[in-house]
Amino acid sequence: MSRADGTAATKHTSIGHGAACGCGASRRHFLAGAAAFGASAALPAMQASAQPAPAKLIDTHHHFYPPQYQKAWGESEDKRKIPHLGVQLAWTREHAFEAMDKAGITTGVLSLPSTPGVWFDAGAEAAHDMARLCCEFGAEMVRDRPGRYGLFAPLSMLDVDATLKEIEYAFDTLKADGINLQSNYGDKWLGHAFYKPILEELNRRKAVIFVHPLVASCCDAHLSVGAFPAIIEVPHDTTRTIVSLLLSGTLTRLRDIKWLFSHGGGTIPFLAGRIEGFYDPKAFSGAKGRGPNGFAPDGIAAEFRRLHYDTANATHPAAMAALQKLVPMSQVTYGTDYPYFAFDQFRELRQLGLAAADLAGIESGNAERLLPRLKT
């Protein structure tokens, strides 16, 4: 194949990925009980806020479901005997747009939720086809509602050459705003060497990468606590993939990628000190973090500060307090996790006593700086 810059691309082989967990494929499962009791009729995410929305509000964590994707998801859940979640089944582009208007969302940046059953069950070729289909559906939504949507294009990631072609198509043909990755693909987090050619191409393009977590195949219902593994495991998997990117040197080596992580960075704000303590060579003789050849030449805290984080399900005062200690608020964007959670989480942000400039940045300014097309 030929790369987008005209240079010959090295032929890469696909690699087997571990089977997806059959019990806790994503954050959706912690709501599955509500769906089983008929909560789908309520669709709480579609309720308008009683408090007026900001003049401009950009949601960088906004899910969408092409019909073929919904069908494949339903089949994967049937295979695993997982109850269907009503808000996902009820989603249509018309309902989603109506909900945005009611809640005062100016722009929603589209991304897929993490659904390993859809990705892995039929193999790399089917995953490639699904990624293409979803990209095209999302791009159509962007074209149909100018200024109201952006697109983080999903990549299949199971075959390197196919994924490089997907990147070229997403940016050069569909004009995607950025890329949508899962935190892991089977048994590999994003710092794994298998993904090196993919991330190098995204670095060359100075891409924004939005990372959405899922329950890892290692940590299904048999190893997690509680009825819904996603409640605990989803934020932990964000931490796993950030640490894999850190320790592999990817964050340092590929400086032109702009990373955006979900849910306030998972548990990174709470574990940052522990991570730094263990991998700082002053505390741990096996670490090689500092120095010109280290994975964190400016220190681990500096690497975490360079990343971007959204506020989806992270507006609790304790969570936001930790995030504020970790990064400047210029690195934080507004996210909702629609349709699983309400659009109006800005009300909780307004109760945190943030400076007016910081609040305005979270609501829209930081996203506009990260994704300049959204300024129009």
Residue positions per predicted region:
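Short catalytic/ligand-binding loop motif for oxyanion handling, primarily in non-cytosolic enzymes
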Residues: 66-68, 116-121, 159-163, 170, ...
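Charged helix-capping and loop-helix junction motifs
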Residues: 127-134, 191-197
